[in-house]
Amino acid sequence: MRHYEVLFILKPTLTEEEVSAKLEFVKEVLTKNGAEIESVVPMGTRKLAYKIKKYERGTYFVIYFKAPTNLIAELERVLRITEEVIRFLIVKYENKKEIAAWEKLSKGIKQNKKEIKASESTEG
């Protein structure tokens, strides 16, 4: 299994329910085709560097996952035909140095989420 990262941008006009439904849809495509999702990073709604399909803003997500190579073509196909996705990028981590960076990123994100939850529970 290879290490990958997919970043995708959703239309800013979607409601929170629609955004979470699309995120679950992408995660389902990954898991049904044999991927192991390591972490999901919701980056929120941000201003785009330039207009994409008449939108100036977009809701960003990054998913770190391990998958067989044949999954990537299916993931690309699904993201291309999904109207709510305005742009996506799939990155493959190949050599040992890149894989070490991938592991650090995916584990660091998990650790940060645990720290945030712990600080929220002690405050409230």
Swiss-Prot record:
Biological process according to GO? translation
Q: Which InterPro entries match?
A: Ribosomal_bS6, Ribosomal_bS6_sf, Ribosomal_S6_plastid/chlpt, Transl_elong_EF1B/ribsomal_bS6
| Swiss-Prot/TrEMBL keywords | Ribonucleoprotein, Ribosomal protein, RNA-binding, rRNA-binding
Indicate the secretion signal residues: none
The cross-references to CDD domains, in alphabetical order and at most eight, read: bS6
Q: Which family does it belong to?
A: Belongs to the bacterial ribosomal protein bS6 family.
Put simply, this protein is called Small ribosomal subunit protein bS6
Q: Supply the source organism for this entry.
A: Campylobacter lari (strain RM2100 / D67 / ATCC BAA-1060)
